Amino acid sequence: MGRVLRILAPNPGPFTLEGTNTWIVGADPAIVIDPGPSEPQHLEAVIDAAGSVGAILLTHHHLDHAPGAAWLAAHTGAPVLAARPELGEREVVDGAVIEAGGVSLHVVATPGHAPDHLAFLAEHEGWLFTGDTVLGRGTSVVDPPEGDMAAYLRSLEALLELRPRRLYPGHGPVVERAPEWLAEYLEHRRMRERQVVDALGRTKEPRSPAELASEIYAGYPDELLPAAARTVLAHLQKLQDEGIVTEDHQRFALAGPRGSNTT
């Protein structure tokens, strides 16, 4: 069985938690997942821990995950593999298998947090590298227009069907009770959607995502509310596509008899 090491990037924050997890998988040569920011001291620590590097994988293009890939590739000669061709030497797609360091990683497309988001499954070991689709603590932001709530929920369902034993997230601790955590993640998002619908149902006045977030996320730190409002917007756009809500100038109401607009 291969090894998994974590090198924590020095970019802590409200959304990155302790920082970005750079994962080193296998050995001689190792696979590096999400080099993180282009910070030489961090990337040198990755090389020191990895030894030889056979491939550099990106879960998605966001600035806390991908920029260090170019530096790491230049200093190791390893190819960068990503869903977006401009990010790497090779484009990888759902169902591809990447082998290095005694580990086979199956590529799983997981759009939602970002359109190019990938997860990587070591099927034999039961390891799932989730990027930002699932964090080790708290929940992930789904921020339109890149963030797509319908796609995100489908991705969570797909990961749950894989029945992994352990999750290695993009931020936060390793999750040992993987199926339970994935199920909780999925139910949490469904709960938030119900809360959005219920909040709209309490008034006939159209409401903005920020107004809804202030109610639904009451008690959350003020600095997190703008991101919460973006995730509420993602829920609203999904509900609008389903004909459950209507939108006028970024204000939303229930469609039909319960809302301010009737059909």
Label each residue range with its predicted role.
Residues 59-65, 113, 171, 235:
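Histidine-centered divalent metal-coordination motifs
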Residues 1-49, 119-131, 136:
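Conserved beta-strand hairpin/beta-sheet module of binuclear metal-dependent hydrolase folds
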Residues 3, 46, 171, 196, ...:
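Residue-level signal for inorganic ion chemistry
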Residues 11-18, 37-106, 126:
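Active-site HxH/HxHxD metal-binding segment of metal-dependent hydrolases
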Residues 199-263:
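C-terminal regulatory/interaction regions
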Residues 14-17, 111-114, 261-263:
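A short catalytic or substrate-binding loop motif that flags glycine-/basic-rich loops and adjacent residues
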Residues 30-32, 37-39, 104-111, 115-199:
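Metallo-beta-lactamase
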